[in-house]
Amino acid sequence: MHYNKLLIYTYIEKFDASFITSLPKKISLIYRNYEKTNINEILKIYKLCKKVKRKIFISNNIKLAIKLNADGAYIPSFNNDLNIKYFKFKKNFELIGSAHTYKEIQIKKLQNIDKIFLSPIFENEKKKKNLGIYRFLHLKKYAKREVICLGGIKKQNLKKIKMIEPAGFASISLFR
């Protein structure tokens, strides 16, 4: 497996044109700001992503993602709403979401999530407790969906990610 075959995501909380345009083209953005929803900010991010041909996902707001014609929506682990699966989506609209446990994976399956972000795979500043490689592999097998590694991903553990063969990975610190 080559790195260029992996799906790669990063998160953004506010409009930053230089950050968005400096990322390699392959990296998809997830707009995630739970403190405030600033539609103008989201629109600027969306327009720039479309201009530079970068995928954009809106976190925890499916209606807005559909309205903007975004590439998809990101459903966080704390969102347990099973009515998500009843929305009408365009053909290539993707639902992606995060999970940390078997129970959360089951909920994501019931929500018809296409790709599940399992986290945290490695220790990071926010969470000292992590899944580790073996627990990650167990959860990956149970998910029966494309799985994305998330949490504590740094340059020094990219080889470990390659070994466990996920569909991709997501990181904040790796790209900042």
Question: Could you say what each language-model-derived stretch is?
Answer:
Residues 1:
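Catalytic phosphate/metal-binding cores of nucleic-acid and nucleotide-processing enzymes, i.e., regions
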Residues 4-10, 27-31, 56-58, 73-75, ...:
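Hydrophobic faces of well-ordered beta-strands that scaffold small-molecule active sites
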Residues 10-23, 60-63, 100-107, 154-159:
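Short, acidic/polar
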Residues 23-26, 68, 111, 142, ...:
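Structural motif
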Residues 42-58, 80, 85-101, 129-154:
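Alpha-helix-loop-beta-strand connector modules within alpha/beta enzyme cores
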Residues 67-79, 93-138:
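Glycine/Thr-rich beta-alpha phosphate-binding loop at enzyme active sites
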Residues 73-87, 117-130, 152-176:
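Glycine-rich phosphate-binding active-site loops on the catalytic face of alpha/beta enzymes
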